[in-house]
From Swiss-Prot:
Keywords: Oxidoreductase. One of its GO terms (biological process) is nucleoside metabolic process. Pfam families: GDC-P. Belongs to the GcvP family. N-terminal subunit subfamily. The keyword Oxidoreductase applies. Its EC number is 1.4.4.2. It comes from the Bacteria. It comes from Francisella philomiragia subsp. philomiragia (strain ATCC 25017 / CCUG 19701 / FSC 153 / O#319-036). This is Probable glycine dehydrogenase (decarboxylating) subunit 1. The glycine cleavage system is composed of four proteins: P, T, L and H. In this organism, the P 'protein' is a heterodimer of two subunits. It catalyses: N(6)-[(R)-lipoyl]-L-lysyl-[glycine-cleavage complex H protein] + glycine + H(+) = N(6)-[(R)-S(8)-aminomethyldihydrolipoyl]-L-lysyl-[glycine-cleavage complex H protein] + CO2.
Length: 455
């Protein structure tokens, strides 16, 4: 598969075919005054002078220190990752269909699947989904197909699930006869009270969805909920932050028999924050369910000459083979993001991932402890969390967040829209990129803002 750039005569021929006189004409819908002009750079300057000039221009942009999490996280991305990803051999987001010409790309995906299966403790992984929310929706559909014992298409979900995931799940399953029951959140401890599950004991469920760490950063009672679900004939779908699995037990170890399907958002591993995407969703499962798994799966094989190679496998599940009977409409994967994640995990290794996760947890704990020393400010829950905590404030949280922006800090995620009991609460997140100085500046800015708005 060639990635050689087009020659001028090839470009001219293509433009002639579509009736365009130039490449600029293809973008004529963009007003001229909005188009980027030539950079104004002095002639004859050396690289150091050029770098200094561009740095001064870049400093005109104002960058707040970010303490927002809520599903998208600021982690350090080693420079080598995107330098490699941007190479012509990798720089495509599409699935490598032509196995004999795509061995390198297929091997990257195979390595990704191996790493994700190891991280989650599952037997198999697909090549990725669009994002964490769609990965959950596909996991629910997969569980319904796979659980032959269930007589209904009902799913039990803990309210502490990420609200965006829930909305996407409802949208995708809206016309498929799938029903959801919600186990209400205990606003006193930020997670599902396992005793409330008995209210649903007489209902037949195909699956139970558990997010841990949940949307509020709390670690769910995964053992109790998993055992309850299996006792009542339901499969367990685990939604998790892959970074947390570097220091927490894997979903395969939840309860007596472990989760059946694991999914989530892969953005924390080498993918930058970029106005909501592109990210990638991951999905792994036990071998018993692999034939119901949606999306691409890369397998290792041997050719006619006995040489080891890679190919797309179990394709009879997919739309281009089964049409309407396929496991899913998805016929691709987030290949470019997966490449970044694979290189990220390879560069850091198990010890590196553990360090990132541990420092993130330590910094979050330190930030919460320092904030709790201020009058009227408290960490809402006393449970163990990973890298996010809910902070109660003595003032309206939405106003507080707005005022903190003026101090150069994105203070956290306003929770009032999520739960009526949390109007004066924000969720803050710290990772390995936050320094002691960053945390100190957050505390000083909080003091200043609370004094200004009456806290």
């Amino acid at each position: 598969m060639s990635f050689i750039p087009h020659k001028p005569e090839q470009i001219e021929k293509m433009l002639g075919t579509i009736g365009a006189s130039s490449i600029d004409q293809l973008f004529d819908e963009i007003p001229a005054h909005l188009r980027a002009d030539t950079l104004k750079i002095k002639d004859g300057i050396n690289e150091i002078q050029l770098a200094n000039q561009m740095r001064k221009r870049a400093n005109r942009n104002h960058h707040n220190t970010n303490f927002i999490g809520a599903g998208a996280y600021s982690h350090h991305i080693p420079a080598a990752i995107w330098d490699i990803v941007a190479r012509g051999e990798f720089y495509t987001a599409y699935t490598p269909y032509q196995a004999e010409a795509s061995q390198g790309g297929l091997q990257v995906i195979y390595e990704f699947q191996t790493m994700m299966a190891g991280l989650t403790g599952m037997d198999a992984s697909n090549a990725s989904m669009y994002d964490g929310a769609t990965a959950l929706a596909e996991s629910v559909l997969m569980a319904i197909r796979s659980n032959k014992k269930a007589k209904s298409q009902k799913i039990l979900i803990a309210e502490a699930l990420h609200p965006t995931y829930l909305r996407v799940l409802e949208t995708i399953t809206k016309h498929q006869g799938i029903e959801f029951d919600i186990v209400n959140l205990d606003s006193k401890n930020g997670k599902t009270d396992i005793t409330k599950l008995e209210d649903f004991a007489n209902t037949d469920y195909a699956a139970v969805v558990i997010q841990s760490p949940n949307f509020l950063g709390q670690l769910a009672d995964v053992d109790g909920i998993t055992n309850w679900a299996h006792k009542h004939g339901a499969l367990v779908i685990a939604v998790t932050n892959p970074m947390s699995l570097a220091i927490l037990k894997s979903p395969a170890e939840w309860g007596e028999n472990g989760a059946d399907i694991v999914c989530g958002e892969g953005q924390p591993m080498g993918v930058p924050l970029a106005s909501g995407g592109p990210y990638f969703g991951f999905m792994t499962c036990k071998m018993a369910h692999v034939r119901q798994m949606p999306g691409r799966i890369v397998g290792r094989t041997v050719d006619l000459d006995g040489n080891e190679g890679f190919c797309l496998t179990l394709q009879a599940r997919e739309q281009h083979i089964r049409r309407a009977k396929a496991t899913s409409n998805i016929c691709t994967n987030q290949g470019l993001m997966v490449t970044a994640a694979t290189i990220y995990m390879s560069l850091l290794g198990a010890k590196g991932l553990e360090r990132v996760a541990s420092i993130s947890h330590e910094n979050t704990t330190k930030l919460a402890n320092e904030l709790s020393k201020l009058d009227g400010v408290n960490a809402r829950f006393n449970n163990v969390s990973f890298n996010e905590v809910v902070i109660d404030l003595p003032v309206n949280a939405e106003i507080f967040v707005t005022e903190m922006e003026k101090e150069g800090i994105d203070a956290g995620y306003f929770l009032g829209e999520y739960h009526s009991d949390l109007d004066n609460s924000i969720m803050v997140c710290a990772t390995e990129i936050h320094t002691s100085e960053d945390i100190k500046e957050y505390i000083e800015a909080t003091k200043k803002v609370l004094a200004r708005i009456g806290g």
